[in-house]
C-alpha cells in the first residue's frame, strides 16, 4: 500500500519520539535536499547530526541558507548563525564500498556515542557498491553486515535516514541490492520533484526486529 506524505510530516515523524528509526528515501536528486532539510531542523534544536556521504552530495550552503531563512522569517526568537548549526554536524566520506562498510560497522557506533549524536544520515550508501570492480559476492556479504550494524544502532536508540538516488544498472544482481536494503528499513519513501512540486510516496511500513548475532553471516552464505 502506498500513500502520499507531506514533507513536513515526514521530517517531524522521523525526529519524533521514540528514537531508533530506520528510514529510507529514494528517488531523484531531491532526496538529498529533503534529508538536509530534516538535518537542519534537528540541528536547530541542538541535536548533533552525523552524516556519512558516499556520493559527494553534502551541501554546506543549504544549511547556511536554512539558518538565514528561519531567522528572516522569524521562526525562532534569536538569530541563528549558520556556524552554530554547522559546528554540530559531523561529516564522514566514503569513496569505496569497503570504506563505506568500515565507516558504518566499525567507526560509526563508537563515534555517535562519543559525540552523543542520536541521528545519522547516510547519502548514497550503495553508490560505491555498484562498481563492477568489487566482486559481487563481497558486495552482498558487505551489505548484510551493514544492515546488521544499522539494526544494532537502532537498538541503541540511534535514528538513521538513508538517501539514495534511483539507478538502473546493467547488472540485474546489483539492481537487487537496493530492494534488499530498503526491505530492512522500518519505512521507505519514494521522492520526486516536478514543476508541480515535491511528491513523497510512503511505500512501506514494517515492524523490524533487530537482527540476531550471526544472521548477517548466515544470510550472506545463502546468497
Located regions from the model:
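P-loop NTPase motor core
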Residues: 111-184
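The Walker A/P-loop phosphate-binding site
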Residues: 1-69, 81
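Conserved catalytic network of the ASCE P-loop NTPase/AAA+ motor domain
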Residues: 16-17, 42-44, 82-84, 111-115, ...
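Short, well-ordered alpha-helix to beta-strand connector turns
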Residues: 19-21, 46-47, 86, 157, ...
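Conserved beta-strand scaffold positions in the cores of enzyme catalytic domains, especially
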Residues: 22-24, 49-51, 88-91, 188-190
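Phosphate-binding/switch region of NTP-binding enzymes
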Residues: 151-223
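Soluble or luminal CAZymes and related metallo-dependent hydrolases
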Residues: 6, 99, 141-145
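Conserved inter-motif catalytic segment of the P-loop NTP-binding fold
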Residues: 52-132
Amino acid at each position: 500500500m502506498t500513500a502520499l506524505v507531506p514533507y513536513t510530516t515526514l521530517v517531524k515523524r522521523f525526529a519524533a519520539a521514540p528514537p531508533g528509526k530506520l528510514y529510507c528515501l529514494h528517488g531523484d536528486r531531491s532526496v538529498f535536499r529533503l534529508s538536509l532539510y530534516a538535518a537542519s531542523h534537528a540541528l536547530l534544536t541542538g541535536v548533533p547530526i552525523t552524516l556519512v556521504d558516499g556520493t559527494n552530495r553534502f551541501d554546506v550552503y543549504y544549511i547556511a541558507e536554512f539558518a538565514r531563512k528561519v531567522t528572516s522569517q522569524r521562526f525562532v526568537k534569536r538569530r541563528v548563525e549558520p556556524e552554530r548549526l554547522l559546528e554540530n554536524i559531523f561529516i564522514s566520506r566514503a569513496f569505496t564500498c569497503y570504506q563505506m562498510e568500515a565507516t558504518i560497522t566499525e567507526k560509526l557506533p563508537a563515534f555517535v556515542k562519543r559525540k552523543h549524536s542520536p541521528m545519522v544520515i547516510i547519502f548514497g550508501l550503495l553508490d560505491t557498491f555498484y562498481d563492477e570492480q568489487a566482486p559481487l559476492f563481497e558486495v552482498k556479504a558487505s551489505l548484510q553486515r551493514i544492515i546488521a550494524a544499522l539494526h544494532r544502532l537502532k537498538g541503541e536508540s540511534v535514528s538513521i535516514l538513508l538517501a539514495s538516488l534511483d539507478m538502473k544498472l546493467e547488472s540485474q544482481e546489483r539492481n537487487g541490492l537496493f530492494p534488499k536494503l530498503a526491505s530492512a528499513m522500518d519505512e521507505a519513501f519514494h521522492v520526486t520533484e516536478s514543476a508541480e512540486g515535491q511528491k513523497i510516496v510512503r511505500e512501506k511500513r514494517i515492524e523490524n526486529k533487530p537482527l540476531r548475532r550471526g544472521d548477517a553471516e548466515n544470510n550472506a552464505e545463502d546468497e
